[in-house]
């Protein structure tokens, strides 16, 4: 090939060399398990949500008198509209399932520890953006649960001292949830997924700066292989399993993860007997309800994300992986059970004994993050191949 041809070869362009560096030749620890495949699955979910959302937006009308009917129009009159809507609605649930598994894998293997603090913090920001995007998207069908969910959740901002009421009025675009609110939420719901794409790319770039963690939690530059083709083939197994799982919900149980009240048009004069958010918000909603005071509940929700953000900045551990930390391993499984219990409590009425159970579960949730720094230096089974320098500094990288 001549010098001129080399200069104009597409594969020689910077963008392709960057893609090759991050997606093809990226050096990956050879012992990664299937638990490391949820990052790529999250990317697939995000693409599905954006593509289906763009097509749904072509037929949706963001007006309080037309929104509910436009959704029914998509379901009944648009060719393939039912498939688009069910893919989008259930795709949100799949997205959160994948991301929750991704987060718990990070907690189990301490993927948040040095030198990947920035990777973890970006992940928490992405998680927060997902919650905001999903919430405002849930309002758009303008059913009963959409309307009253928007009313209850947005009114929580009034608990902020001094500026709370002003923020609520700004969110509503008036003095109640109405047409201005719906228009604002539709605009933001269209915009935020693209911000999520940018945040995800930053997350990926930050990860590749120091490389992926591994099940042993031991850093090594020697035992690595190229991402392609080995981990593409490995991830392909997860992609196929995910496609089957996703298809079951779309074609056999498309409304199970939703709420039947949302098939009733929004009525400001009739309050549902029990207002509950989507299932993936239930653990956080249970923590919110466990505090009787509104301001205290909002502070507890803020503390959830502060705890996640602060996790990487606790003192370093001798060993990352829970495989060598049996005490932490047991506490981790208790945390997982606690989060499932919070999810169940979140959909129960606000009455005894559910309130008490929610308060105990919320206390243990925060206790986990409080004792994690201590557990980082407690345990047995430190691998013998750790060097003396590792033991002195507490660093595994």
Curated annotation (Swiss-Prot):
Main subcellular localization, coarse class?
A: mitochondrion
Q: Which residues bind a ubiquinone?
A: 208
Entry annotated with the keyword Manganese: no
Q: How would you describe this protein's topology in the membrane?
A: Multi-pass membrane protein
What does the UniProt entry say about where the protein is found? Answer: Mitochondrion inner membrane
Q: Which residues bind heme b b562?
A: 88, 189
Q: Which domain of life is it from?
A: Eukaryota
What family classification does the UniProt entry report for this protein? Belongs to the cytochrome b family.
- By what name is this protein known? Cytochrome b
Q: Which organism is it from?
A: Oryza sativa subsp. japonica
Q: Which taxonomic lineage does the organism of this UniProt entry have?
A: Eukaryota, Viridiplantae, Streptophyta, Embryophyta, Tracheophyta
Give the gene name. MT-CYB
């Amino acid at each position: 090939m001549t010098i001129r041809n080399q200069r104009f070869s597409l594969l020689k362009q910077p963008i392709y060399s960057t893609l090759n560096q991050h997606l093809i030749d990226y050096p990956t620890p050879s012992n990664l398990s299937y638990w490391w495949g949820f990052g790529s699955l999250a990317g697939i979910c995000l693409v599905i949500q954006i593509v289906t959302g763009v097509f749904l937006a072509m037929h949706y009308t963001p007006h309080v008198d037309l929104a509910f009917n436009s959704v029914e129009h998509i379901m009944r009159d648009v060719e393939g509209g039912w498939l688009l809507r069910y893919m989008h609605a259930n795709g949100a649930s799949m997205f959160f399932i994948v991301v929750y598994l991704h987060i718990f894998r990070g907690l189990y293997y301490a993927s948040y520890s040095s030198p990947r603090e920035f990777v973890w913090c970006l992940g928490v920001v992405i998680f927060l953006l997902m919650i905001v995007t999903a919430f405002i998207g849930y309002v758009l069908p303008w059913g009963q649960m959409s309307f009253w969910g928007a009313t209850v959740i947005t009114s929580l901002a009034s608990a902020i001292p001094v500026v709370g009421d002003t923020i609520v009025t700004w969110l509503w675009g008036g003095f109640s949830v109405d047409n201005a609110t719906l228009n604002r939420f539709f605009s933001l719901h269209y915009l935020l997924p693209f911000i999520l794409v940018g945040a995800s790319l930053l997350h990926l770039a930050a990860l590749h700066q120091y490389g992926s963690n591994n099940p042993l939690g031991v850093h090594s530059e020697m035992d690595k292989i190229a991402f392609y083709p080995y981990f593409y083939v490995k991830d392909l197994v997860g992609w196929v399993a995910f496609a089957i799982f996703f298809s079951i919900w779309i074609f056999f149980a498309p409304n199970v993860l939703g709420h039947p009240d949302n098939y009733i048009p929004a009525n400001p004069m009739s309050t549902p007997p029990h207002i509950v958010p989507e299932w993936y918000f239930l653990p956080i909603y249970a923590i919110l309800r466990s505090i009787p005071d509104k301001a205290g509940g909002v502070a507890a929700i803020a503390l959830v994300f502060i705890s996640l953000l602060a996790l990487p900045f606790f003192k370093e551990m001798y060993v990352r992986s829970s495989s060598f930390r049996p005490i932490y391993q047991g506490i981790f499984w208790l945390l997982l059970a606690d989060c499932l219990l919070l999810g169940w409590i979140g959909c129960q009425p606000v009455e005894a004994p559910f309130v008490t159970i929610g308060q105990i579960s919320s206390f243990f949730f925060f206790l986990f993050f409080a004792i994690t720094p201590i557990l980082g230096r407690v345990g047995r089974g430190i691998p013998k191949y750790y060097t003396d320098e590792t033991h002195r500094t507490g660093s595994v990288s």
